[in-house]
Amino acid sequence: PTRGGRARGEPSAHLPPWAFVLFLHNHDQVGNRADGLRLTSLLAPGSPALRAAIALQLLAPHIPLLFMGEEYGSTAPFFYFTSHGPELAAAVRAGRAREFAASMHDCDPPPDPNDPDTYRRSCPWPPPGAERQAWFEYYRELLRLRAHLL
């Protein structure tokens, strides 16, 4: 990849697959969405496509990275949050308003990243239930298989 016409990074073809981290989504991708939605909220519940992607992620030779709550199918939004002083907090708010201005026609504005409630809403404990347990068991079984195969 390039930035400003200059190459970035280093060649990596000589590195083994386990030198790389593989994820389906992470805090940057989810937190930088205005709505903070995760893949589990963007796809139909129990989606075969999501289950297949998880299997590919966990059974590939790369190091799997699970995003917070992914292992139990969390559908809670994960919002961008900060704890900046007043001046920087205002600049971040203004920057995010500009960033999302063109795409916020039919949805609520993103929550204030510096509001402590935004942090609390992004870090919920999973609600109990059979669906959460089923996701957890799916991950557990794939990780057992991974340990056996790799």
Specify the residue positions occupied by each region the protein language model found.
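Loop/helix patches that line or flank the sugar-binding groove of alpha-linked glycan CAZymes
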Residues: T2-A7, S12-L150
